[in-house]
Regions:
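Conserved beta-strand/short-helix segments
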Residues: 1-301
């Protein structure tokens, strides 16, 4: 913890050594905040049971002098045979309570303190102890289905704003799974945005309820069940029939929800392209068959 870094600051450092049969071998260092400051990173250290439920134990490191002696703790995930050097989470004292100081002077995490079958973390500070509750981790798979599968501008199937239009319904579904133990906190909120033709300046399609090409939505989901929502839109008259219309969904778990958190490896964007109907056969591949015939007519010959 007394290691001197840049500008002669007591930044601290944690070295990783691998235990062998005869000796210890160096296996790198743990990376903390790069800002030169008195930190005493490594003042406290705890090996904790698997916090992210990937099958490997993790490490928590305290840095009680960071942020002007307010303090912080770092969470590092374990991997096969080592510890990942880049921290996965930095928890600042200032984000918890304005009066905390020397947060991270001691750390411990071996027990479930709130009865949800997850190991929680206890962190010592000046005149205080803070319990950090673990949260479940969910993997969310988003999918898009579109009906009809292509846009036929010659078959306008619905009236919109006083004129016949081509209407399409995109249905987004979210399916959640979890590798965390126990059954609590299985319900959570999802906030998502849907964009039509997200890279184009002019709108070729808009949503029925807003007449805009971008909408913000939210829904409630639960582990083990699919949560779906229809998104009806219609196509505006356009001269660009070559490039397909894109539907892009970007989502995140609701920040205001105290339930589970999203697995950092989960993709948060799904995109689908809806082509225009070309009437080019079963393979939808149009092959041009243009023939040019020329004749010469010389006047006066």
């Amino acid at each position: 913890p007394m290691y001197l870094g840049g500008q002669s600051k007591e930044t601290g450092r944690v070295y990783i050594y691998k235990v062998g049969q005869l000796l210890l071998t160096s296996n790198g260092t743990l990376r903390a905040d790069k800002k030169p400051q008195d930190s005493r990173f490594g003042y406290s250290l705890a090996a904790v049971p698997d916090l992210n439920h990937d099958g490997f134990n993790d490490v928590v490191v305290g840095a009680p002098l960071e942020d002007g002696h307010r303090g912080a703790v770092y969470v590092y995930h374990g991997s096969r045979g080592t510890i990942l050097p880049q921290y996965q989470q930095r928890i600042e004292a200032s984000s918890l309570h304005p009066s905390l100081s020397y947060f991270g002077r001691s750390v411990d995490g071996q027990m479930d303190l709130d009865g949800d079958e997850l190991v929680d973390l206890a962190v010592g500070a000046q005149g205080a102890a803070v319990v950090l509750r673990s949260r479940r981790i969910v993997q969310v798979n988003a999918s898009l289905a579109v009906h009809p599968a292509s846009i036929n501008v010659l078959q306008k199937n619905c009236p919109r704003h006083g004129q016949d239009s081509v209407c399409v319904t995109a249905t987004v579904c979210f399916r959640a799974t979890s590798r965390s133990p126990g059954r609590g906190d299985r319900h959570f909120g999802i906030e998502y945005s849907v964009a039509l033709d997200d890279r184009k300046f002019g709108a070729r399609a808009v949503f029925d309820d807003t007449s805009q090409k971008l909408v913000q939505k939210r829904l409630r989901a639960s582990v083990g069940r699919a949560a779906c929502q229809p998104l009806p839109f219609h196509v505006i008259d356009t001269t660009d029939y070559l490039r397909p219309v894109s539907v892009t969904v970007t989502f995140a778990l609701s920040d205001s929800d105290p339930g589970p958190v999203l697995d950092e490896r989960s993709a948060t964007t799904v995109k689908k392209l809806i082509p225009f109907f070309k009437d080019c056969g079963e393979d939808n591949e149009c092959v041009t068959d243009l023939v040019l015939q020329a004749s010469m007519d010389l006047a006066g010959s």
